[in-house]
């Protein structure tokens, strides 16, 4: 069963673009803007993955008999776990109201690397 992931591709590009903006705000020292944009990004990414996990992936599992499609869903779900670990680290960085931790940019870069790889995989093999 083919699933149209075109909307996911647009969302993925928006997530990566917003994450780059957050990093730019952190690097320029604009902590209030970084916190605002990161909060928006994090909330949307959590909702996006919850929707995929709860509805899209469950639907594919329910309707597909293709072992390759099911293996792809298994891999994408495992990637979501990796993403959530990196996202949780960044969520911790942006919690509170004081200065951002010194390793915030490194944490954002690590999150972006995992997110970009996941997005590429989902777009390449998710259809």
Q: What kind of region is each of these model predictions?
A:
Residues 1-127:
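Small-residue-biased structural context
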